[in-house]
Amino acid sequence: MLDVNFFDELRIGLATADDIRQWSHGEVKKPETINYRTLKPEKDGLFCEKIFGPTRDWECYCGKYKRVRFKGIICERCGVEVTRAKVRRERMGHIELAAPVTHIWYFKGVPSRLGYLLDLAPKDLEKVIYFAAYMITFVDEERRTRDLPSLEAHVSVERQQIEQRRDSDLEARAKKLETDLAELEAEGAKADVRRKVREGAEREMKQLRDRAQREIDRLDEVWNRFKNLKVQDLEGDELLYRELRDRFGTYFDGSMGAAALQKRLESFDLDEEAERLREIIRTGKGQKKTRALKRLKVVSAFLQTSNSPKGMVLDCVPVIPPDLRPMVQLDGGRFATSDLNDLYRRVINRNNRLKRLLDLGAPEIIVNNEKRMLQEAVDALFDNGRRGRPVTGPGNRPLKSLSDMLKGKQGRFRQNLLGKRVDYSARSVIVVGPQLKLHQCGLPKAMALELFKPFVMKRLVDLNHAQNIKSAKRMVERGRTVVYDVLEEVIAEHPVLLNRAPTLHRLGIQAFEPQLVEGKAIQIHPLVCTAFNADFDGDQMAVHLPLSAEAQAEARILMLSSNNILKPADGRPVTMPTQDMVLGLFFLTTDSEGRSPKGEGRAFGSSAEAIMAFDAGDLTLQAKIDIRFPVGTIPPRGFEPPAREEGEPEWQQGDTFTLKTTLGRALFNELLPEDYPFVDYEVGKKQLSEIVNDLAERYPKVIVAATLDNLKAAGFFWATRSGVTVAISDIVVPDAKKEIVKGYEGQDEKVQKQYERGLITKEERTQELIAIWTKATNEVAEAMNDNFPKTNPVSMMVNSGARGNMMQMRQIAGMRGLVSNAKNETIPRPIKASFREGLSVLEYFISTHGARKGLADTALRTADSGYLTRRLVDVSQDVIIREEDCGTERGLKLPIATRDADGTLRKAEDVETSVYARMLAEDVVIDGKVIAPANVDLGDVLIDALVAHGVEEVKTRSILTCESQVGTCAMCYGRSLATGKLVDIGEAVGIIAAQSIGEPGTQLTMRTFHTGGVAGDDITQGLPRVVELFEARTPKGVAPISEASGRVRIEETEKTKKIVVTPDDGSDETAFPISKRARLLVGEGDHVEVGQKLTVGATNPHDVLRILGQRAVQVHLVGEVQKVYNSQGVSIHDKHIEIIIRQMLRRVTIIESGDAELLPGELVERTKFETENRRVVQEGGHPASGRPQLMGITKASLATESWLSAASFQETTRVLTDAAINAKSDSLIGLKENVIIGKLIPAGTGLSRYRNIRVEPTEEAKAAMYSAVGYDDIDYSPFGTGSGQAVPLEDYDYGPYNQ
């Protein structure tokens, strides 16, 4: 068996009949499957043991040889080889067909590859294949030309004979008529009778003439057909063809069905055809040229590969191994079988019947019918339903063919190769574990025992608690007490992976150190819930166990939750205290403000002294007091040092100081690192996130993790002691509400009257009412706000950011206000009641309308968002960091600061998502002094420093300007947002980009909504807009952009309206037809620049690329995608969007091929285009010219170089057909390809540069060790394999929060 890790490419091609016979272990001759009495496979049938191998290990069919000692022997009685039964998953058979059949993929696919090769329309091809027309396969041109005069003479003689026969027959009939008439006259017959006789005679004579004419016409038709007969002509008229064959059968050959195509393909000259097509491309135009290009693609595919076109017509059909199409017995004695067996049986039955008919010498019409049925049976086996009605099984269900086994979500690629189920896994409900440290999880004992069973058993044997593995297993099953002691020892520092579906980004799987817990639920640390998007309302999570030392090391170093504090989408912390914790810390840091609590104004010598007073009940947490802080404490930012007295030294950073603060804040600061500036303000959710952000940016991960744990513990501790609860009495409806509502009701009536009088339109009335009631709602909300004391629990929850917002509070205590209907239009009738007062029936009904739409929307959004993520992953999966630095000097100029109206510099709003975490492309120099050198990471600290120096824009490295041949380089990517350090080589940044864009997809709205004033002015927003951008579709209601700079003229007629631009350079005017309702951005006589938008709306990215070039379309797409995410408050870094856009623009359309081996109109990878042109220029030829092509992500995924990746994405059969014809080779660069064939993925530690590394100490390391300790006891041989042990994080002990 091939070792999967030691080959570089995987090629697919067309299998010829010889290949199929070579793979086969024998011919399947009978349609039988198994004997229903003995339940053993039938000989020569579809499950035959002689062909496919034994059904039992080391046992032949007849039972003569049993046991492994006869390995390899072929039984002389039954012919079965003695071997393992698993060969029945590998061995193939074949069916020898009595007549050739075409492969449906190549004739019925779009475009039809067979049709393109032979230059036949698919309709005509179908006629030949299904025996509705004859095809001429050979014409003896030379002999025909030589014999033409004599044949023509022969035909003219025959024509004369027909005419002579006609004339003599007519003459005889005329004489008979004369005789008859004479006789009648003699008898004295009436004129009437004579007339009838004459008419009858004339009728017969006409028939004679017509028959003769038909014969002559037929003869002429046959002769003309023969004269102009060419190879590949079709003849659908059976009688005409027979006559042709009878008369001139020695000059040509013709036949029906796949046999005709087979003969044609054998004599087909590929080189000659290619030359002819190239000539047409050089000289032809329009449709003819386009068709020639498409045909040349197919012809050159066969020329440039070892494929033979004969492979498209099959003489034998492979039979896949029986264990891949199993037959199993059900309880009632019946059998369930794979559909493939039924399809194979149909093929074998028809094939055997055809053989019998051929042996009997049956008439041609019967044989042809049987051949057609065989063709249809093979079609159904390969791709059921592709042509005609599908073959159905019981209950009219279409049978699953070989193609269906590969296609779609349930197909082989996505079900079994990309999504396998794994062992050493478990699943259970999750509950919160507030006592856990950030890197721990609680694992139920029963689950841990089952997962770690092999480890426990081995350890029991090692410790002599059990004699052997068997007895150890018995001990585990009986649950002896010693087993749990050993389990405790085994799981220590052995990380497990926890995964919550749906895994939308990399933080959906994290590693934790397990702690044994009672019960059956997994315990989760509260801070990782955000990353998993988990809550405890019945969510379940899966546990996976990393087994090898390498897997454990990766889990601990890369995946441990305390190492995954940052979110890969924007590089900001994701493990943020929420809900109760925020409430507790907010309670801790609020001050008395206006109240005089116990202990207010006292002074204390230290925090400990103040705590003592608090414990004694003499002081509250919120009382403002003076506390003296010890040496080393950093005062708050903006701290003013105390005025010094005469002779005293000046106060310096680190000295003791006294501060007016609260005990709560002093306790809060003890949770933070010692050298963190003192926090002397109320800490709500927003302030807390700023603090955690700051910590993540400035401190090592270990300190951040410990601080987060401290914040969690203190948050829960003080939330419990704060006594914050929710009661109905906490919700107070403002007294002023009635008055306010009454006032606005008057205004409402006034508007209503104006409408009834016809003074305002319906649209205006709606807008006025919405404005009135929005104002009313806001006024009630303000009154409600003033009504809530600061200490009100509901108010505290909202103000701290723990839960809820002002809008929800307004609906509970103020008034519900205006709601929207299912079309997302605001209903102008407000809901005047609040939930506290209770809604009337009508009000309740109105409010349910929009709410139901919201729920339906969410369900749809989830599916659409998941599909978007899948397409994004597919298009970007091979973008991996491949090198340190590509050496480019290019970059993007990005703004980092903007000037206010008064001229002061402020940090630009989008710095967080654009400049942050990139590398500088060049030195930042001010007055000849380098402030920041090139290739340095732009973190928060450096950006602040640059803004302070007055720098407004910087040139940064970017993925879009990276020049790496494969993947991208670390310097152009910059900082890895998930780790906060420069990205490592091997990081799969493409997939991270796709996850970062796809994960918040569910939060985006689905709406295409109507903007209030303008009817029909639809704006696509939310998820559909993101999809539209990434699929590079022309937007709905596209806004034209000017193709040249010039003057604007607006022309308007009764029905149409257009903007005409007269270019400055005097070239032709350009007219842009627009709708009468479009809102203009330019006026009559304005001057526009090239690429300027002329109306309101979205621009077409293809136009931007064509008119303004590649850089402009990149900026446009990044900006538009960010606009959608920003509108929902989602933060995603530009670099993720840039990766996707780079993949969309990585292909070039060839315009002129020059001397390069490229076809005009062909789409090629940019790198291939540049490499080929370089080669041509070096050889002194003309390079090819091309233009950049913007492709949508679906199209870009299917156009990838890797056929494995494309086939597993969409349109599986089309991709495989194409790949097989082109004999494509997959160089296994991306991730999907390697997952499919079971190789290590070429990312992270799977990169070849990281495998088989020997670690040796450097000279410096040795010297340092020598100086540190006695060198006799150190072994400097190369390090061996790791033990899999790791350093516990508990080395950093911060103790309880309040010591």
Swiss-Prot record:
| Any Gene Ontology biological process | DNA-templated transcription
Which prosthetic group or cofactor does it need? Answer: Mg(2+); Zn(2+)
Q: Where does Mg(2+) bind?
A: D535, D537, D539
Any one GO MF term held by the record is: zinc ion binding
Q: GO CC terms on record?
A: DNA-directed RNA polymerase complex
Keywords from the UniProt entry: DNA-directed RNA polymerase, Magnesium, Metal-binding, Nucleotidyltransferase, Transcription, Transferase, Zinc
Which EC number(s) does the record attach to this protein? 2.7.7.6
Q: Which family does it belong to?
A: Belongs to the RNA polymerase beta' chain family.
Name the UniProt record assigns to this protein: DNA-directed RNA polymerase subunit beta'
UniProt source species: Streptomyces coelicolor (strain ATCC BAA-471 / A3(2) / M145)
